[in-house]
Curated annotation (Swiss-Prot):
GO terms for biological process: alginic acid biosynthetic process; negative regulation of proteolysis; positive regulation of secondary metabolite biosynthetic process; positive regulation of single-species biofilm formation; regulation of DNA-templated transcription. The keyword Transcription regulation applies. It comes from Pseudomonas aeruginosa (strain ATCC 15692 / DSM 22644 / CIP 104116 / JCM 14847 / LMG 12228 / 1C / PRS 101 / PAO1). The promoter for a critical alginate biosynthetic gene, AlgD, encoding GDP-mannose dehydrogenase, is activated only under conditions reminiscent of the cystic fibrosis lung (i.e. under high osmolarity), and at least two regulatory genes, AlgP and AlgQ, have been implicated in this activation process. Belongs to the Rsd/AlgQ family. The keyword Ligase does not apply. Keywords: Activator, Alginate biosynthesis, Transcription, Transcription regulation. This is Transcriptional regulatory protein AlgQ.
Length: 160
């Protein structure tokens, strides 16, 4: 998961400051996840779990309230029907994964993730969901980046 995060930063870093910041948050989230998922003890470190949950909330919130809106706005500004159609297809799955992440956070806040075995099982599911989410997000960025690059090559002004 960390390797795909690095690849995303290498591919799209510098394209847009908002995306750069978001990809950095993704990397922090993955690192915190890796630290947390390495737990073998019966009880997780409460501070590590709280830190991870905060990063998770920040990341999914930035995606929904900043990045996805920006990607959609740029797709509209560039007249990128392909990108907008892709977003329309992808957003429901991203929303479902966001809901799952928020539920995980709520369970942790309620103390339902204090058991090591329970947490390990939840992290396994969350890992799969985050991996899928990152792939879907990368696909959206790729489409935007391609439209942006093609429009820039044609000499069009870049709306921001």
């Amino acid at each position: 998961m960390l390797e795909s995060c690095r690849n995303a930063q290498e591919r799209w870093g510098g394209v847009h400051q908002l995306i750069d910041r978001w990809l950095h948050e993704r990397q922090q989230l993955v690192q915190a996840f890796d630290a947390l998922s390495g737990i073998q003890a019966p009880a997780p470190n409460a501070e590590e779990l709280q830190h991870f949950c905060q990063l998770l909330l920040d990341y999914v919130s930035a995606g929904h309230f900043e990045v996805y809106e920006q990607l959609t706005a740029e797709g509209k500004a560039f007249g990128d029907q392909r990108g907008l159609e892709l977003a329309k297809q992808i957003f429901p799955r991203l929303e479902a994964i966001t809901e799952s992440a928020l539920n995980f956070n709520d369970r942790c806040d309620n103390g339902d993730c204090r058991e090591g075995a329970c947490l390990i099982a939840e992290l396994k599911v969350l890992r799969q969901q985050l991996h899928e989410r990152f792939e879907l997000e990368d696909c959206l960025i790729e489409v935007l980046h391609n439209a942006h690059s093609q429009s820039g090559a044609e000499g069009s002004a870049v709306p921001v």
